[in-house]
Amino acid sequence: MIFLYSKIHKDIIIHNLLKKNDRILIAASGGQDSISLIKILVELQPQWNWDLGIVNCDHSWNQSSRKGSSQIAQIAQLLNIDFYQIVTCHQLINEEKAREWRYQKIEDIAFSNKYNVIVTAHNASDRIETFFFNLLRGTSITGVQSLLWTRSLSSGINIVRPLLNTTRFELKNFVKEIHLPLWPDTSNQSLFFKRNRIRKQLLPYLRKYFNPKVDKVIAQFAEIIHDESFYMENVTQIIEKQLFFGSKNIQQEFIENLPIAIERRIIKKMIEKKLSENHCNFLNIEQIRFFFQKNRKKYSLLECIHFFSN
């Protein structure tokens, strides 16, 4: 138990995840991961003088999620921590829609109550599952990075994941050792959800028939991708600034000599600015790239993007 406190405390310091006097909103479902997170942050709170709050999102998928929400409210009351509950008033048809709804509502609660950090209970096992989920649905290197330690939202609030170096197995043992109460969500067992299929079918198959240490291999690969993608993003931003200070002719000559990887990133950024993220897929980026190559003497890159928006 002491080892896990120490390990997570060390990760918070090494990755500069949280600061003294932070106002932290803990996203909690009632499962072992979020209950563990609440316990750990409450124990560390005196050292950091954090101001803690708890938020729970009820997707209304089943009876167990409602029971979990009720129990989380009781825990918050017992700990004298501010509690916020959000219940959906319309049916969330899939995991992606549920995730979008959940993050938006939590951000709204955090912003309106002046929390500067949202903490989630995503762990090392979630990171691996998210890697496969993103990879199998089709994504870029940036998209396949999986879960990051921290991410800034447009509101200025940071999402922080202090359990990313801790496995679900470690959290399970932690919960058992100190007898924490649990209210499992039965939706986590349903194979209707793709993430559950990855957890219950794909990963056990890979461990058995390909590599028993596949979790560690993927976790290391996710870290490498993150670091390399961070570097590429910085390079792209520098080139983007240089590119659009010049005239149309300078832009064409400059782009002509860019590596394809950077060219794709430049196009992706322009699509996001001029159109929307919904247009940012491999097919659209490649169509614009090839069209620009054929017509670079005639049109600027921005004009090519406008053609595809009509």
Swiss-Prot record:
Its EC number is 6.3.4.19. GO terms for biological process: tRNA modification. CDD domains: TilS_N. SUPFAM superfamilies: Adenine nucleotide alpha hydrolases-like, MesJ substrate recognition domain-like. It catalyses: cytidine(34) in tRNA(Ile2) + L-lysine + ATP = lysidine(34) in tRNA(Ile2) + AMP + diphosphate + H(+). This is tRNA(Ile)-lysidine synthase, chloroplastic. Pfam families: ATP_bind_3. Belongs to the tRNA(Ile)-lysidine synthase family. The keyword Nucleotide-binding applies. Keywords: ATP-binding, Chloroplast, Ligase, Nucleotide-binding, Plastid, tRNA processing. Ligates lysine onto the cytidine present at position 34 of the AUA codon-specific tRNA(Ile) that contains the anticodon CAU, in an ATP-dependent manner. Cytidine is converted to lysidine, thus changing the amino acid specificity of the tRNA from methionine to isoleucine. It is found in: Plastid, Chloroplast. It comes from Mesostigma viride. GO terms for molecular function: ATP binding; tRNA(Ile)-lysidine synthase activity. GO terms for cellular component: chloroplast. NCBIfam families: lysidine_TilS_N (TIGR02432). Its main location: plastid. The N-terminal region contains the highly conserved SGGXDS motif, predicted to be a P-loop motif involved in ATP binding. ATP binds at S29, G30, G31, Q32, D33, S34.
